[in-house]
Amino acid sequence: MQKRGLLASSIVYVVVLLFVTSVAFENPAFSQVQEKGPHIDQARFIHRTDDNLALEEVKSGSLDMYFFPIPHEAANDARNDPRLKVYDTTAGSLGFFVNPAPAADPNILNPFQFKEVRYALNYLIDRDFVVNEILKGYGSPLIDPFGIYSPEYLNIIETVESFGFRYNPSLASSMISDAMIAAGATNSGGRWVFNGNTVTINLFMRQDDPKKVSMGELVASELEKIGFSIQRDYGDLNKANTVVYGSDPKNLQWQIYTEEFAGSRAFVKYNPTIPAQMYAPWLSRMPGSQNPTYWNYQNATLDEITQKIAFFNFTSEQERNQLVSDAVKMGIQESVRIFVAQKTDPFVASANVRGLVNDFGAGITSKYSLLNVRSGGDGNLSLDIGVKQIHQGSWNTIGGLQDLYSASIHSMVADTATFRHPYTGEVIPFRSPWTDITTEGPVDKIDLPSDVIKWNQTLQQWVQAGEGSTAISKVTFTPLYSKWHHGIQMNVSDMMYADYFTYEWGTNTGPGDRTVDAEYTPAVSEALKLSKGSRYVAPDRIESYIDIWHYDEKEIAGSGAFFATEPWEVLAASERIVTDGRLAYSRSEAQAKGIEWYDPIVREHAEMVKGELQKMKNEQFVPPALRGIITIEEAVKRYDASISWIENHGHAIIGNGAFYLDNFNVAGGTITINAFRDFSYPFEVGHWSQYETPQLAEISSVNVPRIVTISQPTPITVNVEVSGRPSSNATVNYFVSNKDGIVVARGEAQPESPGQFNIDLTSEMAAKLSPGPNQIKIFATSNEALRPDISSSTILAAPGALGSSQGTNNKHQVSGDISAVNTEQ
C-alpha cells in the first residue's frame, strides 16, 4: 500500500487497499539491548484446516492461539477450560453477493438482473434460522453493512428498522413470479423456463467453512421450492477470487455467492469506505470490478453519495449522517449485496498468553495484538499461531491484501502513517505523527505556497502549484523513519515515490497509457481530485494540502498524512514488470489479460522482481520521479539490498514494521515473522500496553413504567456502570419504535448523578406511541470504548389515565448467549 492517509487510505481499505540479512537484525540478545519492537522474538503462522483440531492443539499447548473462530458448538466448553481464554469478536458478517448482470446469451435469463427479484431474497432468507441454527445463537440478524455494534448504527437505525424484513417465502415467491412473468418467463410443471431453457442459478459456496455451505444450501432449497434449478459450485477463497470476483459477470459463472466478511482491519469510528465497498461501483468491489472489458454494475446515485462520504464532501455532521443513511437505504433496495447475520465469533488463545488486544474491528488478529503479546511464566519468546488459510490471494500492496489471512499478517511487517484506536476508532498517529492541522473548511480555502509540488504524468516530472492554487486543509507531519528490513535507511525518496505512484497510477491519460489498472486507477482518480500537492519542507517534515474537511480534525490528519510501506526500488521494479504486461496488480486485470496476479510473497514473482532489479542496476536506472533526489550510487545500493533480501528469503515483502517476514514455507504451510530489533525502529517494547483492557459500559438496570399513557410525559431511568463502577463517563442513546417497527422518538439520555441517566419521554413523543406494545432500545457506550451495551424493553401504551407502576427492563443480549467492516474471510 502506498501513499497512506484517507486520501489514498479512504480507498485503501478497499482499493489499493506492504533486510539485509545481517545477524544483528535477527539476534535475540541484540533485541533485548535495544528494547525496540514487540515483546516476542518470533511468531509462526501455521496452516490448520480443521477448527476442532486447532482448538485441541491450543489446549495441549502445540499452538498458542488460533486466528480463526472456533466452532460455535465448542465455545461454551472452551469458556470453562482453564487452559484457554476466549475472545469474542462481533465485527464480522455473513451474507450473499448477487450477480445482477444480464446473460451474454439472449436465450439465458438471469433472474437477478431484476432488482425486484434481488430484493425479494430479503424475504426468502430466514435470518433468524441462520442465527439460531447455523450460528448456534452466536450472532444477530443483519440487513445493513455496519451492524448493531458499530458507532455508525445509531445514524442508520431508523432506516434499518423501516424495512421490517421478516421471513415470508410466500411474499418472496409472489414478487419473484411477477418479475419473471414480466420478463417473458413461464412456470411449467413447477419450473421456470425462458425461451425453452430451464432457468438455472449458479450458486457458489465456500466449502472451506461449514456455515457458508449451510447458508448456501438454505437459499438453494428456498429457490428450488419456487421453481428454479440450482447448479451448485464449491471452492475456497482462491477459487472465489477467480470465479466470483475475477470473472466477467455476464458469463454467469456465478449468480449467488455465500460471502463472509471478517470485519475491518481496524475499528473505525466514522467509517468512510464501508458504504462504497459494499454498495457502490466506483470502488471496484461490485460485479465487474470496473474492468472496462467486463459488464459492470452501475449506479451513479450510489457512486455520488458514497464518494461524498469517502472524501468528506459534507459541511456538517448532520449532513454526513444523512448521506450514510441514504447510501444504506439505496444499497438495501438494490440488494446486490445482501447482509444476513452479524456474527459473534469466539477466538481462543492459551491462558498463558498475555497482552492480546481485542480490537473492536479486527479482534485479536489486529496489528496491536502481536505488538503487545507476551507469554506468561515460561520465558517463551516465540509463538505458534494457527491460521485457517496460509495463502488465499496476492500480497501486493496495490491491488492485493484483500483477504483476512494476508492482511492480518502483512500488517505486522508494514507500518502506516496513522492507525485507529482499537476501542474508540479514532485516528491516532503512528509513523507519520502530525504536528499541525490547519483548515478553513468546510467553505473557505488556504492559499498554497509556491513550492507545493505534485506529479504531472504527462510531463513526467514534478510541477509546482500554479499561482492562485488553494486547498481547504493543510496537515503538517513528521515521518518517523527507520531502516527498511533489508537494512537501508528510509528517507524522503521513499515518501516521494509513494506520492508519485498515487498520481501516476491514479491518472488515466487515455489510450496508450500503460500505468493504468482496471481496479486501482478509477478508484484512486476520485481521491486525486482532492489532492492539491505536497510541500517537502525538510526530509523529516512534510506538508500535505488537501480539499478535505471533517468536523473531527483527527480525520483530516488521517487523510493528509502518508507513509511509504515498501522501498521505492521494489515498487519501481514491480511497475516495470506490470507495464511490460508480464503481471497485473489487480485480480480482474490479471484475469482479463490472461496473466498472473502479482504476488511478491510467491518465489516465482519475487524472482521476477529480483531480475528486474538487476536490470535496473545494470542500466544505472534512476526513476524519473527521483531524478535530482537520489544519486546513481544510492540507487544501486538499494538494488543490491533488495536483491540480497530476495536471495536470502525467497520473497519480495520488504517492510518497515516491528516484525519482518522471514520466510514463507509453501510445502510446510507456514509463514514466519521475526522481531525487527534495529535501534532505528521508533517504538519500544511495551509501547502499546495501554490498549490491553477496554473500559466498557454496562447497563445495570432500566426503570420503565409497565404501562404508559399515550400523550402523557413519562420518565425513564437508566443505570450505567463503566468497568464495574457507576459512572457518567458514557453516552446513552434511546430509540422508541411503535408496533410497526417505525422509530417514533429518539434522543440522548442526560446524566443525573454518577451512573444514573434520565430519559424524558415528552408528551409529544408519547403521542406517537401505538396502543399496545411498543419497544424502547437503549444503547449505553463508554466514552473510552465505543462498543454499546444494548437493552430492549417493551412499553405498553394505552389511552386515558391508567396505572403506571414501575418495572425493570427485560435486558437481552442481541448476540444470543454472548454479551456484547471489512476483509473477505
Predicted region positions:
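Surface-exposed, Gly/Pro/Thr- and Asp/Glu-enriched linker/hinge segments
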Residues: 30-41, 73-74, 80, 111, ...
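Ligand-site clamp/hinge motif
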Residues: 32-76, 229-231, 492, 684-712, ...
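Periplasmic binding protein-like
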Residues: 55-70, 75, 79-84, 225-284, ...
